């Protein structure tokens, strides 16, 4: 029933918490045009004992723009996400922090403040929507002017 309705050349992957790690694991797939990581990042660890097999080397294989939406320092995944951000240097990356903790505000109607920024990222990256781009890029970027959010980015200005 979905034949002809899906754009197989415009694929995004996203996930929250452990699902974000799974999204990062599949992000190097050549079909992926963008990744969105919610309250997550690849675990920081010094030993190979973890049951989670993905490690920071996976970040070297990224080929498409990636966005991290994190719940601030109170988010259990904050350190993992900020470490990922620091390591990513080959692709455009954006990190947006809203200090709501690990579960953010997903329980609010319509997903709370995280939902519209996620939609804007997808509209920009998959549809080329310039109004959506302005949420993240430019001298008066929408999130940049919102004191509730802390925004960091690298190489976003390279994107159309």
Positions of the model-derived regions?
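The feature captures the conserved acid-bearing segment of alpha/beta-hydrolase catalytic domains
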Residues: 33-108
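Sec/Tat-exported extracytoplasmic proteins
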Residues: 30, 39, 125-126
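Gly/Ser-rich "nucleophile elbow"/oxyanion-hole loop immediately N-terminal to the catalytic nucleophile
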Residues: 1-21
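Extracytoplasmic low-complexity repetitive segments enriched in small/polar residues
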Residues: 13, 64-68, 117, 128
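Divalent metal-coordination and catalytic microenvironments
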Residues: 11, 95, 122
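Alpha/beta-hydrolase-fold serine-hydrolase catalytic core, especially in secreted/extracellular enzymes
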Residues: 91, 100-103, 108-160
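Hydrolases whose catalytic domains are alpha/beta-hydrolase-1, hotdog thioesterase
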Residues: 22-26
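Solvent-exposed, acidic/flexible segments
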Residues: 16, 28, 59, 108-115
């Amino acid at each position: 029933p979905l034949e002809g309705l899906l754009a197989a050349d415009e694929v995004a992957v996203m996930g929250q918490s452990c699902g974000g790690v799974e999204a990062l694991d599949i992000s190097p797939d050549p079909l992926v045009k963008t990744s969105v990581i919610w309250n997550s990042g690849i675990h920081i660890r010094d030993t190979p004992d973890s049951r989670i097999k993905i490690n920071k080397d996976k970040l070297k294989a990224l080929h498409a723009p990636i966005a991290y939406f994190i719940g601030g320092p109170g988010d259990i995944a904050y350190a993992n996400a900020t470490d990922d951000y620091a390591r990513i240097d080959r692709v455009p990356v954006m990190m947006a922090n809203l200090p709501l903790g690990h579960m953010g505000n997903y329980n609010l109607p319509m997903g709370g403040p995280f939902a519209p920024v996620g939609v804007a990222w997808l509209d920009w990256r998959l549809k080329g929507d310039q109004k959506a781009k302005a949420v993240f890029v430019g001298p008066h970027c929408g999130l940049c002017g919102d004191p509730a959010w802390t925004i960091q980015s690298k190489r976003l200005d390279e994107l159309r």
